[in-house]
């Protein structure tokens, strides 16, 4: 062996040793013992549960975020075994200020030790965990804490996912998301991702703990498109539902849109899931403007007049204006979908302002002129444009972006979880709760349950099959993203562009919303004043004249309210109902209201409720109007109490709609 060969052997030997040492060092760094980390656990002061998505920031701006257990694994050279101050902040949560006005905690960062930071929840809803993305339990794994998921670090190679829809299919929960990110390149796939999970009580986790998702993946292990089309464009699905076909097989159907851009579609139609290919395939394809509504939102089952329907919580703005009978031939034919409208059959112009809303089949509006579909669809979109709620606390108008509607057994009402467009602290990051007596309304007052600071949380959806304690506890999730409300520079590591789950206790007194008090004909030229449940029990929806005002139900609790009672009196012309705040013996309150104070509330929706008496008939009438146009009515000088006014607009009641016995 010459000198050159000997030198080459020595160099190769040294390189091998260095590679082996580097590998050992890398392996050691990847398997650091948990004892090297200082563990910080942030818990909800009210519940004691760990809080995800809490930022801890050092005085030199190193940012950490708690994982889904509320854990941060801290290991920072130069900052171990010393006192470190962490600024602590989180959307909808906060810690108290110190004497200098700083919100945070000073902790001794001892390896192997744990510190607990208690944080106060401002949100009514409780943040539970992240559903999708990488590193859901990263810090818990690093610190040796137990985790509930089968794939707590990476599942289906999914880095981020947009907008959820779900339904129960073949006894399991079927999940859909839109655009999906991957680790290996900035572009993932854009033709809808899917997964399944077991239901709680049937092999699935308690929804308070998490969801074990089984993704549909390709050969490379990455989530694969489940609605692949040959033509170019992103493919998004919504309106997910199941129905049995002509031979009794359960089928899953969705509306699809093939998009050119975020706001422009190339085509829209209906797609059916193929159990063999495990993909959605178009069954109806059309121009993007030929469906009754451009987006279907979330479908929910309703029984109406002995028939089973799917109603749709249509977005932009959120309103329930479409349904289809739950039959195979109907759900795959847009012409058989029904719309709630004032438009007349063979529509040729704008709707009459005096016309009443009723359910009409789409093909009945279009008639024999198929070319009229786009014109009718545009008119339907205009008709629902001016839809809004009111903040029960401030009286401010809320424009609903999108959300879901389901019947809640605990509240005996239809409830909506929806997103606000144009929120104050985030453009599309404020989530609200509302209730109604029927699925189409009357929807009026709402309460904010989730807030974000210059960050989006869009397309929220309730998961009714996760309800607990008879519906007292409900679960909802949405997409957390900087897009639309924040800046990419402030994107939250791991959490951004992913789904986050919340839980809401419907017995929280802050959810005591004003309910409609209906003015109902009594059949004797008089009027009754009833809550929706009383109207339904008596079967008197057809006798409802109007919503007289809104007040708090007597079974709800709130500070500073007075009870109002309905007292029956006899007049020369028969029976009359009179409201009073002083009860008769053993009387039960009809509703709760605010006391009749003199000062004007800053909430312009809160109004004095006046009693009017008709001398000739002896009847009584109650209104928030300071004067009535009708003759013969004399107003009491002082108001009975203060209530929430009935907003102007059409009275939307679906008296025949009942909750279905399944989702």
What is the meaning of each model-derived region?
Residues 11-24:
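Bacterial N-terminal signal peptides
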Residues 24-38, 45:
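Beta-strand-rich domain onsets/edges
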Residues 30-31, 101-123:
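Extracellular beta-sheet/turn segments enriched in Thr/Pro/Gly and aliphatic residues
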Residues 36-38, 46-60:
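Short, ordered, surface-exposed loop/turn motifs in non-cytosolic proteins
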Residues 61-76:
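Short, acidic Ser/Thr/Gly-rich low-complexity loop/linker segments typical of extracellular
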Residues 79-106:
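A short, solvent-exposed loop/turn motif at the edges and junctions
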Residues 112-159, 168-233, 242-292, 303-397, ...:
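Beta-rich carbohydrate-recognition and catalytic domains
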Residues 514-663:
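Extracellular glycan-binding segments that recognize GlcNAc-based cell-wall polysaccharides
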């Amino acid at each position: 062996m010459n000198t050159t060969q000997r030198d080459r052997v020595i160099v190769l030997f040294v390189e091998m040793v260095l590679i082996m040492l580097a590998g050992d060092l890398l392996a050691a760094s990847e398997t650091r013992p948990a004892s090297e980390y200082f563990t910080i656990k942030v818990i909800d002061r009210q519940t004691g549960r760990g809080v995800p998505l809490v930022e801890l920031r050092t005085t030199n701006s190193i940012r950490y975020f708690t994982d889904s257990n509320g854990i941060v694994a801290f290991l920072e050279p130069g900052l171990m075994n010393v006192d470190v101050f962490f600024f602590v902040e989180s959307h909808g949560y906060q810690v108290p200020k110190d004497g200098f006005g700083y919100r945070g905690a000073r902790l001794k960062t001892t390896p192997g030790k744990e510190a607990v930071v208690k944080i106060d929840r401002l949100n009514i809803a409780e943040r539970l965990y992240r559903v999708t993305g990488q590193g859901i339990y990263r810090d818990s794994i690093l610190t040796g804490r137990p985790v509930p998921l089968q794939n707590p670090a990476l599942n289906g190679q999914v880095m981020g996912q947009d907008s959820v829809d779900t339904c129960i299919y073949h006894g399991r929960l079927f999940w859909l998301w839109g655009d999906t990110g991957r680790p290996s390149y900035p572009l993932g796939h854009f033709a809808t991702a899917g997964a399944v999970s077991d239901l709680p009580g049937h092999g699935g986790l308690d929804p308070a703990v998490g969801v074990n998702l089984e993704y549909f993946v390709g050969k490379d292990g990455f989530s694969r498109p489940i609605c692949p089309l040959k033509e170019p464009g992103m493919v998004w699905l919504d309106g997910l539902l199941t129905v049995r076909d002509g031979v009794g097989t359960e089928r899953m159907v969705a509306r699809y849109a093939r998009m050119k851009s975020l706001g422009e579609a190339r085509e829209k139609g209906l797609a059916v899931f193929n159990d063999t290919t495990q993909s959605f395939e178009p069954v109806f394809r059309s121009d993007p403007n030929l469906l009754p509504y451009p987006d279907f939102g979330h479908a929910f089952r309703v029984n109406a007049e002995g028939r089973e329907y799917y109603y749709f919580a249509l977005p932009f703005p959120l309103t329930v204006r479409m349904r289809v009978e739950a039959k195979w031939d109907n759900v795959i034919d847009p012409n058989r979908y029904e719309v709630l409208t004032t438009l007349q059959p063979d529509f040729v112009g704008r709707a009459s302002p005096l016309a009443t809303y009723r359910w009409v089949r789409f093909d009945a509006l279009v008639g024999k002129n198929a070319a009229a579909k786009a014109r009718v669809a545009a008119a339907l979109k205009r008709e629902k444009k001016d839809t809004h709620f009111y903040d029960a606390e401030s009286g401010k108008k809320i424009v609903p972006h999108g959300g879901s509607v389901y019947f809640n057994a605990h509240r005996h009402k239809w409830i909506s979880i929806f997103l606000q467009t144009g929120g104050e602290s985030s453009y599309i990051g404020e989530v609200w709760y509302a209730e109604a007596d029927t699925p189409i309304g009357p929807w009026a007052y709402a309460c904010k349950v989730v807030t974000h600071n210059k960050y989006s949380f869009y397309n929220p959806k309730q998961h009714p099959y996760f309800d607990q304690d008879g519906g007292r506890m409900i679960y909802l999730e949405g997409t957390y993203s900087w897009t639309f409300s924040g800046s990419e520079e402030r994107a939250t590591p791991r959490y951004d562009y992913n789904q986050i789950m919340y839980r809401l206790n419907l017995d929280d007194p802050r959810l005591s919303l004003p309910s409609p008090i209906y003015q109902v004909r009594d059949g004797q030229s008089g009027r009754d004043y009833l809550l929706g449940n009383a109207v339904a029990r008596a079967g008197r929806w057809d006798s409802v004249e109007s919503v007289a005002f809104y007040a708090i139900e007597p079974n709800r609790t709130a500070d500073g309210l007075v009870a109002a009672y309905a007292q029956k009196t006899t007049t020369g012309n028969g029976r009359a109902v009179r409201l009073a705040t002083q009860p008769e013996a053993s009387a039960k309150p009809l509703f709760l209201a605010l006391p009749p104070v003199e000062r004007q509330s800053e909430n312009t929706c809160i109004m004095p409720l006046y009693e009017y008496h008709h001398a000739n008939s002896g009847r009584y009438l109650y209104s928030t109007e300071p004067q009535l146009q009708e003759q013969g009515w004399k107003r009491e000088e002082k108001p009975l109490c203060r209530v929430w006014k009935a907003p102007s607009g059409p009275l939307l009641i679906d008296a025949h709609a009942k909750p279905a016995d399944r989702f």
